[in-house]
């Protein structure tokens, strides 16, 4: 008798396990944020290590969130794709709240450049997740400043940029970004490309946003205001 679970049961089990892991990581992340909020580098000798632990837990939480979304297939009844009008001020407030303690603990300044009253249509939860993931990465690579800039382009796109003043993306990561924006999940090698999952997820979220013949897109480049890495999400 073959006791091997079939594919649907295995997928459900893996998704449930990932969800439990994400909940545990969220508890750990929240605990670290509270500890860091009560400490300073002067009063707590382990402050730098705690800040690094917070970065790593947020990175792991991002990966689990992305895996869950892919398992549940965003756009199906199990994980609906919900596009609604939202003021950019509300979007940015959510992102800043999620990143505040990590930025503070790592000594990184967040610069904001956007019109808080501008309204755009997008899936709020997914875009918050993509921007938070991009800022987490920028915090790791920057010298001391991360910039979140959101603007409309002359040809009618909403451009969301996360920039830093670090050394810029290495060639391998720029190539990974180019691959992630072109390939399907089956073509991405997540095992050999550590950045692949986050980039693929972000590009899929971008492509899900459509208006008439336009689809959202993602690109990575070096330059921007500070000459470092630039994560650029474009929504129609």
Model-predicted regions and their roles:
Residues 75-81, 119-122:
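Conserved micro-motifs of the catalytic ATP-binding
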Residues 207-223:
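Glycine-rich ATP-binding loops of the HATPase_c
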Residues 145-156:
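Short beta-strand/loop element within the Bergerat-fold HATPase_c
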Residues 164:
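Acidic ATP/Mg2+-coordinating residue in the GHKL
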Residues 168-176:
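Short helix N-cap motif at coil->helix boundaries in the Bergerat
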Residues 84, 109-118:
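Conserved catalytic submotifs in the C-terminal HATPase_c
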Residues 55-63:
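Short alpha-helical segment of the dimerization/phosphotransfer core of two-component systems
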